[in-house]
Amino acid sequence: MNSSAVHTPVDPKQAHILVVEDNVSNFVLIARLLAFMGVQKCEWKTTGWGVVDFANTMSRVDLILMDLRLPHEDGYDALRQIRIDPRLQNTLVVVVTAHGSTTEMKKAREAGFDGFLTKPLDADQFPEQIRQILSGEPVWELGI
């Protein structure tokens, strides 16, 4: 999110979330956890390539959960495209990665991501992490 932008809190039950994840099992877990929270809309894209065009087909996007290691265009490349798109530039974009390290987290923060979650996701903590993110509170966690 643009550092000068103010995030308007979003109720998870009204949220429109785009998950950019190439692993079907990971997407299914995320989608089920979001559905359990009552998230209104969850869309899935398997690569960073074309993520802006895809997101612009959605009526709105409140949050993008982005894997870093993706085919064709990684999460960092996709984020750069998102940040220059007038409609999406202030959208919250949070890393969800299996490559959790302090170095990767620092790189993600410097690149302009709005948060960092590591896989495997903790099914007990994930709903609260998403609530925090949607309310405008950053979540930067390496997990276990």
Model regions and ranges:
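The feature encodes the CheY-like receiver
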Residues: 71, 89, 101
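Non-catalytic signal-transmission and effector/linker regions of two-component phosphorelay proteins
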Residues: 1-18, 31, 124-144
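Two-component/phosphorelay signaling modules centered on CheY-like receiver
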Residues: 24-43
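A Lys-centered signature of the CheY-like receiver
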Residues: 119
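Acidic, metal-coordinating helix/loop segments flanking the phosphotransfer/catalytic sites
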Residues: 44-63
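Active-site residues of response regulator receiver
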Residues: 67, 97
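Conserved acidic carboxylate
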Residues: 21
